[in-house]
Each structure stands twice: as structure tokens, then as C-alpha cells.
Amino acid sequence: MRGNKNYYFLSLLYFLSLPILHFSSCTHKCGDIQIPFPFGIGEIGCYLDEWYQVECRPSATSGKVFPFLPKINMEVVNISLPGTNDDIFYTYPSFSSIRVKSPVASMGCSTDGNDSGLTLNFTETPFFFGDQNNLVAVGCNNKASLTNVEPTMVGCESTCTTSNNSRSIPFFNKVGCSGSVDSVTRDLLPKNYIPVCSTTKIQDDTLICNGEGCCQAKAPVGSQQLIGVTITNSTNGNLTKGGGCKVAFLTDEVYTLSNATDPEQFFSKGVTVSLGWFIQTKNHSFLQSLDCQNRGELDKGKKRTRQCTCDNHIASGMGYASCACASGYKGNPYVSDDCQDINECTEYKNPCGDTRILYRNTCINTSGGHRCIDYHIPEVMLGLGAGFFVLIVGGGIWWWRKLLRKRRMTNRKRKFFKRNGGLLLQQQLNTTQGRVEKTKLFSSRELEKATDNFNDNRVIGQGGQGTVYKGMLVDGRSVAVKKSNVVDEDKLQEFINEVIILSQINHRHVVKLLGCCLETEVPILVYEFIPNGNLFQHLHEEFDDYTALWGVRMRIAVDISGAFSYLHTAACSPIYHRDIKSTNILLDEKYRAKVSDFGTSRSVSIDHTHWTTVISGTVGYVDPEYYGSSHFTEKSDVYSFGVVLVELITGEKPVITLSETQEITGLADYFRLAMRENRLFEIIDARIRNDCKLEQVIAVANLALRCLKKTGKTRPDMREVSTALERICSAPEDFQVQIQIDEEDETTKLFRGYSGSTEIARSM
């Protein structure tokens, strides 16, 4: 155990000694090129690991030495750290860059042997392509393209035409941003990094390589590590030259018509390509020894406490990092304590602005920055006085504008209140005080506060007529606030009358109208809030809940039929719902049904229709007789309720697609056909089929069949429907009924049980 501790201690001392060795005995320069750590020349310890080892080799022609990276077999042109003035890789502020000499792809040249393609592969290395590189092609009849950049296509075409005014266009130079960024590099990219996807521009468009002898296209960005270059012969028919030397290469240098005329020159001269690099090492102790602050902490708003920052990431035991000196410091972040404070007061010209005596500022250098102090007291006082004056004048203007805006808003609310019939509503509320004392006229401010200014997060329903928001009143009550999209001004009188009528409805299975607001452009209705969704959701969506029981569905049918019977007959004046459907039947926390969205729909509808002239309703629920005559009656509500009964029995939606023929049909027609063919048991919802009271289901099906008769006169009214459902619900378990077939379809009656059991079915 002691031996292991000694080993770890010696290893730590060794890793901490690496930067010291770099300063004391290592060479920092090869020729005219600086070699900053983690790169290094010489013995182990002068560089981080083999990826960063640099050899200083002599040139075979000039005799001068040049730096060389043996691990990737490339000559080094320049190495820069982030934040330095010579950092050409400026679009990666968190990455360092290195420029290396790159080979070229060629065809038809004296030295290539028809090598028409090359591949630059930096996978599994700490190097990747920078975004300053372009694809350049030189030579006649030359079509060059990049490979391994899918799905991006990058290429251009260089031709030599008969006329200097005729220039070819790159055959696909629309460069997209590559999405092939490896996960390690993506984690190290700065969060504010925006890749550059446009092609390279030169101020003088007449000099750019635009296809006449040479062409260029922007290489994709995104930290790619594998790119290939290929050359093919162009098939352009307007050529005077087709042979000769052709070259193509990836480079960060700018080539124009003046310096890219001879393809052969690129073999001797060479080209440079820009690469980004980061730290890739298994030596986690080295990263810890830098004592840099994690850049993620700064992104979260944490105060800077170190002289350097790093983006760190560990994957598969390998440590990855990209470091930089913090703002206000300069140096090498990969050498411990090498980031030194910049004295802005001496290194920058006029860091505090104007240096005239009257406005003299004193610069004081601070760690990572500087401060400017104005010692000219009179000007300070003058500035404070002017500031107070501007503040007072600005405050007065703000208060005056606020007063005008408030007065304008008050006048607007008063106008809306009068136009929306508020005076008439107040008068009628006063005359019926005893019956509608709970109805309230809400102010727009109350409802804005209750719904958080009608915040989209409060939306609980949205449809053609308007949007419903969940709100909370100051007394703690949860309410549903219905804000219509448009109002028909010709029907405002009718709307007010409906509010009076609905305010007098007091039925436990009808959603209570609590009041309205008339101070807005369109009237807003306020209902009690029902928290458990609607029947449609529980029947047709993934709800594994209480409604899967037949007894619960039977109770819902009894409750809502009683509510509609009350609206048709027991209310002070008949109210026809006109849009009965499962989405308008709400369930509270105890699965008690409540009817919503009745009566007022014709007053606040966005389609401006009169209920006796234009068809309105929901597909699958509309009475076919009403559809043909445009005349709505109480029996039209009965038909829609019959569709809801079929939904409760079958669990199907009002419009279905037949599995055999893929034909779209209404649930009512599908149900009538199944009853004619004595297939009721087959279409019963599988969730209730095994534990339901079959005689009750048959009785309800017979009742639904009567409700769905095509002529309104032959349908029962809602009072009969409600009474029949209550009798079915309370009948003994062993009662028997017959399956009753629609006589209009001229089919034979099928029976279940004995003939004496028809009394209940006929009474329905």
C-alpha cells in the first residue's frame, strides 16, 4: 500500500515538473517559428505527448530548418494560441490553431503520375479542419470536389474559354454547414460559436477565382477531421483547352486570377491548410495542474476567480480541454501561471478616452482590467445636476403619458361596455336580482390578473369559437375564462339575453356561468372550472381510469340526459344546445358529468350564422334532418345525444374508418348497420365487454337507435330519454330486453329474451 502511495506521489511530481522543464531546458523556436507548449522540441517533457512532438528538420534545398510534426507527417507553418494577435483561426475564440503544409491532388502534371485524389485524415487526433479553408482548383477543364463531407456538396469547375468575357460558374458551390461534428469536439465548442457558411469574398470581384483558369468554393465547417479532394475532367462543350496540368487542394490562403495561373507551381511552393487543435491526453493531472477555471461556471454567471479558463471534457478515460487566458491576461494557458495581467494603462493608447486637461481621466490598472477615475470635480457636479434635471423631466413626461394612456384605456373600456350592451345587462340584472344575484360583471383587470394577462401557459382549450384559459380569482376560486375570437355586433342584444337566461340555470350537471366581462372588444364569459378533462379524452385517448367501467358510463349518460332534459323543458325558457358532443361533456374529480358550451354559441360564434339558416355543429354529431332543412329543433339535440350514447357503448370516435374497406363513415351509420346485422356484441367497447351488464347495454343501444332515427318526429324527446335511462339504470339485474331494429330501414326485428321484456324498450 505504501509503495502505491509513493508511486502516485512521484508521478504527480513528474507531471507537475513538465512546464518547469519546458522553461528551463527546452527549445522554444525552430527557425523563425515559435513553438509554444504543449508543443515542444527535444526530449520527453518538452512536449505534452507524441501528438505535440515537433522535430526541427533542415530543408533539402535551402538548408534552413523548419518545424515538422512526425505524428501527422506535416510541416508546420505557424502555431498560435487563443487570444493572440496572429491567431488566424478567429472564429474559434476557444481554440488554438496551427497552419501546416498540405499536399495537392493533381491530374496531367509532370510530377504526379495522375494522382487525381487525396485524403486528409485527422480522425483520432487532436486536430481538425478550421473554417477558413477553401477548396481551390487551378487548370483548364478542371472539376474539383470534396468528399467525406456528406450530406454537404462542395465543388467548383475551372475552364478556359474562347472569350475572356465568358466565365463558367461553379457547378455546385452552395455550401452548407456540416453536421458531422464528433461529440468530443462539440462539447469543447463555445456556446456562442456560429459557423460561417458563406463563400469567400474578395473586394475586387474581377480578381477572384471565379472559374476562368481557377475556381474556389467554401469548405464546410463544423470541426471535421476527414476530408478528401478529387479531380475529374469537365464536360463543358465551350472549351478551347482540355488537357494540361490540373491541381486541386484545400487551403486557408487566398488565391486570385493573378497568383493562381500555373498549376505546376503548387508542387514546389506547396499550400497551407488551417487546423484547430485542443488538448487530448490521458494525463488528467496535467489539466489539474493548470489550475484554470471551468468555462461552464462563467457561462452560468459565476464570477471569474482564475487567470485562465478551460473547457474540459472526459470520454473513455481520455481528457479533452481547450484553454485560454482570461480576459485582461495574456500568455500561454497551458503553462502553469504563465497568464499574466495586461497593463492596459501602458499598453493601450487612451484606455480611458479623451485625454484633454478639462476632461482628464486617470487610468488605474487592476487584475484582469483597469479603472478610469475622473478627478475633475466641477464637471462631475455639472454632470450630476444635468442628470437630475433629465431625470425630473423624463419622469414628468413618463407620468403624463401614463395618465393619458390610463384615461384612453378607461374611455375605451367604457365604449366597449356600452357597445356590448353593458347598460342593458345591468338593468336586467337589477330587475331579476332575486334570481341571478350570483351573476357578476367582471372587470377586464380582474380577468387579466386571474389569467396572468391571458398567458399562453394558462390555455386549457382552443377551438373555432375562441380560447379558454384557466384562471384564479382573488377569493381563490378556479374559473374557466372563455375569450371569443370575434363577435357579431348584430347579435349583442341576443348575447345579453342569453347571459340572463344562462345565469338563471341552476343544475348540478350544467357548468355554472359565473359572469361575464363587457369591457373588452369581445365579451368574455367566466364559468366554474371543471378539472378532470372531457369525456372525449377519457373515451378515445390513453386514459387508464375509472371511465373504463360500464357503471360509470351509465351514470354519465343518466347525468347528462337529465341536464339536457332540464335545458329543454324545466328552464325558464327552452335552451337548445346545438353542439352536443363528448368534448362538451366535462368530468369533475369524482367523474360527475357536467354539460358545457351551450346556448351562447350562437351569440359569440365567429361564423356569424343564424341558427335557423346556416348549418353549424360538429361532423358526426349533426342531425341529418337539420342538415337538409337548416331548421334546428329540440330533436336535433336528441340525435347528437344518441351519437354520444353510441360512443359510450362502442368507445369509437364519431367519425371512423372501416378496417375492411378503409371507407370513412359516421359512427351513427356504422351503429345502425351493426344493429341490423345483430352484431351489437361485436362492437361493444372491449374495455367494458366482459364486465358490463349486457341487458343494460342492449337497452341503451335500443334507446340510442331511437335517438338516431332519420326523422325528428319519430325520435323521443329529451325528457323521455332521461326517464328511460334512469329506469334502465335502476332496473333489476335479471331484466331482459329486445334488440330493436330501426323500422325505417325495413329490416326484421331481432329479439333477445322473451317477448314480455319489450315493455322497457317500447317505453323508451
UniProtKB/Swiss-Prot annotation:
Keyword Chloroplast in record: no
Reactions it catalyzes: L-seryl-[protein] + ATP = O-phospho-L-seryl-[protein] + ADP + H(+); L-threonyl-[protein] + ATP = O-phospho-L-threonyl-[protein] + ADP + H(+)
Active site (catalytic residues): D579 (proton acceptor)
Modified residues (Phosphotyrosine): Y527, Y626
Subcellular localization: Membrane
Lineage: Eukaryota, Viridiplantae, Streptophyta, Embryophyta, Tracheophyta
Stretches of the chain found on the membrane's Cytoplasmic side: 401-764
Gene Ontology molecular functions: ATP binding; protein serine kinase activity; protein serine/threonine kinase activity
Modified residues (Phosphothreonine): T613, T618
Keywords from the named record: ATP-binding, Disulfide bond, Glycoprotein, Kinase, Membrane, Nucleotide-binding, Phosphoprotein, Serine/threonine-protein kinase, Signal, Transferase, Transmembrane, Transmembrane helix
InterPro entries referenced in this protein's UniProt entry, alphabetically: Kinase-like_dom_sf, Prot_kinase_dom, Ser-Thr/Tyr_kinase_cat_dom, Ser/Thr_kinase_AS, WAK, WAK-like
Keyword Signal: yes
Transmembrane intervals: 380-400
PROSITE patterns: PROTEIN_KINASE_DOM, PROTEIN_KINASE_ST
Cellular component annotations (GO), alphabetically ordered: membrane
Pfam families reported for this sequence: PK_Tyr_Ser-Thr (PF07714), WAK (PF08488)
Positions contributing to ATP binding: I460, G461, Q462, G463, G464, Q465, G466, T467, V468, K482
The protein, known as: Putative wall-associated receptor kinase-like 13
